[in-house]
């Protein structure tokens, strides 16, 4: 079943006439055309009969025509009202309720004479949750490039270097491999600074005998990677090394349990129980992982409350961590493809 037919099924289920998609990544997912419209309207209308209409600034029309999109294009000037160029009456319209602003909703009511709204967010999330072979190949390449980033960062470590300097070196050097954009702000934290799970790299200087936490990812042809390694620089103290070994055991055990049909919460419990049994449960404050694809964090989450089942074609992260203020912060994260038989680890830098 195609992506569009899934949307049509949802239109029928909710007795709606059309779906209105405005999130740039979701529009790309359905059309193959990516745009960052800023304040301008950029939207895909999918009608119950399968017709697709893309609204975009007129200056982008030729780019859309050169893409894989085969539907109708409504290009508008900044001085024009896009809705006046495609007059419609849509009784019930499905929208991305998590993203559409109140102002845009008012425009839809006026422009398309909408009487009621439904939600198409979950349907799109479920579609994006299962990756195609093409998507998997892009994520695999993004993961390979993330491995290279870690390699670049580790090779640059030296006593006295700052966190910020290591970040800059990674992001500048990886451009030589064709990377134009990181998945998110690269994180490099030294020693006990890594006890802040989302710390900001700064001017802290690297000392001998401490851990260095790298959390980073790259975007390859719109698809993200996201990995974390905690690397020895010298010989950290005994407690820090004990924490590292516990996190590694938790991650390894959780990954080995991955296969279709297993509830996501069970994977979280495996890692969390290991950490708790070793006395560090209170220092593991976040979920075990999340979905990965066009965004570095997407549906579904690997958490203690998610009863949904793992399915072949999902790509998730597994990232247990222990963060003890004044001592150390350790997180290890890999990107995992759920296969028919079990799993494939996509990130490979040594642990």
Curated annotation (Swiss-Prot):
Mn(2+) 2 binds at residues 215, 226, 333. Mn(2+) 1 binds at residues 226, 290, 319, 333. InterPro entries: Creatin/AminoP/Spt16_N, Creatinase/aminopeptidase-like, Creatinase_N, Pept_M24, Peptidase_M24B, Peptidase_M24B_aminopep-P_CS. Its cofactor is Mn(2+). Gene3D superfamilies: Creatinase/methionine aminopeptidase superfamily, Creatinase/prolidase N-terminal domain. Keywords: Hydrolase, Manganese, Metal-binding. Its EC number is 3.4.-.-. The keyword rRNA-binding does not apply. It holds the Pfam family Peptidase_M24. GO terms for molecular function: hydrolase activity; metal ion binding. It comes from the Bacteria. The keyword Cell inner membrane does not apply. Binds 2 manganese ions per subunit. Transmembrane segments: none annotated. Belongs to the peptidase M24B family. This is Uncharacterized peptidase SAB1567.
């Amino acid at each position: 079943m195609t992506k569009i037919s899934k949307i049509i099924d949802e239109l029928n289920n909710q007795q709606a006439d059309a779906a209105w998609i405005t999130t740039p990544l979701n529009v790309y997912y359905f059309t193959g055309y990516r745009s960052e419209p800023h304040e301008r309207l950029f939207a895909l209308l999918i009608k119950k009969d399968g017709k697709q209409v893309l609204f975009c600034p007129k200056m982008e029309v030729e780019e859309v025509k050169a893409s894989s999109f085969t539907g109708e294009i409504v290009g508008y000037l900044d001085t024009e009202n896009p809705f006046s160029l495609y007059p419609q009456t849509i009784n019930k319209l499905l929208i991305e309720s998590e993203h559409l602003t109140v102002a845009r909703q008012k425009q839809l009511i006026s422009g398309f004479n909408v009487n009621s709204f439904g939600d198409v967010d979950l349907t799109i999330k479920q579609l994006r949750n299962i990756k195609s072979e093409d998507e998997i190949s892009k994520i695999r390449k993004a993961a390979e490039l993330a491995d290279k980033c870690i390699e670049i960062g580790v090779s640059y470590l030296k006593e006295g270097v700052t966190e910020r300097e290591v970040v800059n070196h990674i992001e500048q050097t990886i451009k030589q491999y064709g990377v134009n954009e990181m998945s998110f702000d690269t994180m490099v934290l030294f020693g006990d600074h890594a006890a802040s799970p989302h710390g900001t790299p700064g001017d802290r200087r690297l000392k001998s005998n401490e851990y260095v936490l790298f959390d980073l990812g790259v975007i390859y042809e719109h698809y993200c990677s996201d990995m974390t390694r905690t690397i020895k620089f010298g010989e950290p103290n005994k407690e820090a090394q004990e924490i590292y070994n516990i996190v590694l055991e938790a991650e390894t055990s959780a990954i080995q349990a991955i296969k279709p049909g297993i509830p996501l919460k069970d994977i979280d419990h495996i890692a969390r129980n290991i950490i708790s049994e070793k006395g560090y449960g209170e220092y593991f404050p976040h979920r075990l992982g999340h979905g990965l694809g066009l965004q570095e964090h997407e549906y579904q989450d690997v958490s203690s409350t998610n009863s949904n089942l793992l399915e072949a074609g999902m790509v998730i992260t597994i990232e247990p961590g222990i963060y003890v203020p004044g001592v150390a912060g350790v997180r290890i994260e890999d990107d995992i493809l759920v296969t028919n038989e079990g799993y494939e680890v996509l990130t490979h830098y040594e642990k």
